[in-house]
């Protein structure tokens, strides 16, 4: 006997504002049962001696020191820009003033 019924899926769809067909209700009810069975199996295997973790291996960020290096001259950079105003890039306005 399925634990997730068509009525359960229809209720979740309404709450989620999803329009599901009759075929989708049947298919998703079966799929959700399979998913819940898999979660139950994992839950039964994972004991209290297993720490919860988001990754199987520890993650370590590798940082490097900032290094100041020469860059292009301002004039050369602005020469490649499509529009310039007062030694700055000119871009289209996207926000209205109030």
From Swiss-Prot:
Q: Which InterPro entries match?
A: Asp/Glu-ADT_sf_sub_c, GatC
| EC annotation from Swiss-Prot or TrEMBL | 6.3.5.-
**UniProt xrefs under Gene3D superfamilies:** Glu-tRNAGln amidotransferase C subunit, N-terminal domain
Q: Which reaction does it catalyse?
A: L-glutamyl-tRNA(Gln) + L-glutamine + ATP + H2O = L-glutaminyl-tRNA(Gln) + L-glutamate + ADP + phosphate + H(+); L-aspartyl-tRNA(Asn) + L-glutamine + ATP + H2O = L-asparaginyl-tRNA(Asn) + L-glutamate + ADP + phosphate + 2 H(+)
Recorded protein name is Aspartyl/glutamyl-tRNA(Asn/Gln) amidotransferase subunit C
| Tagged with keyword ATP-binding | yes
Question: Could you cite one Gene Ontology molecular function of this protein?
Answer: glutaminyl-tRNA synthase (glutamine-hydrolyzing) activity
Q: According to its UniProt entry, what is the function of this protein?
A: Allows the formation of correctly charged Asn-tRNA(Asn) or Gln-tRNA(Gln) through the transamidation of misacylated Asp-tRNA(Asn) or Glu-tRNA(Gln) in organisms which lack either or both of asparaginyl-tRNA or glutaminyl-tRNA synthetases. The reaction takes place in the presence of glutamine and ATP through an activated phospho-Asp-tRNA(Asn) or phospho-Glu-tRNA(Gln).
Output the GO biological process annotations, alphabetical, semicolon-separated.
glutaminyl-tRNAGln biosynthesis via transamidation; regulation of translational fidelity; translation
Q: Which organism is this protein's natural source? A: Acidothermus cellulolyticus (strain ATCC 43068 / DSM 8971 / 11B)
Q: Does the keyword Protein biosynthesis apply?
A: yes
Record's superkingdom? Bacteria
A single Pfam family it belongs to is GatC
Q: What is the lineage of its organism?
A: Bacteria, Bacillati, Actinomycetota, Actinomycetes, Acidothermales
Which proteins does it associate with, and in what oligomeric form?
Heterotrimer of A, B and C subunits.
Instruction: For this UniProt record, give its keywords in alphabetical order, as a comma-separated list.
Output: ATP-binding, Ligase, Nucleotide-binding, Protein biosynthesis
Which family would the database say this protein is a member of?
Answer: Belongs to the GatC family.
């Amino acid at each position: 006997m399925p634990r997730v019924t068509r009525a359960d899926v229809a209720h979740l769809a309404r709450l989620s504002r999803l329009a599901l067909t009759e075929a989708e209700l049947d298919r998703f009810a079966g799929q959700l049962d399979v998913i819940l069975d898999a979660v139950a199996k994992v839950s039964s295997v994972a004991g209290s001696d297993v720490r919860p973790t988001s990754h199987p291996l520890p993650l370590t960020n590798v940082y490097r020191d900032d290094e100041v290096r020469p860059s292009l001259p301002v004039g050369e950079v602005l020469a490649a820009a499509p529009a310039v105003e007062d030694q700055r890039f000119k871009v289209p306005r996207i926000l209205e003033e109030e």
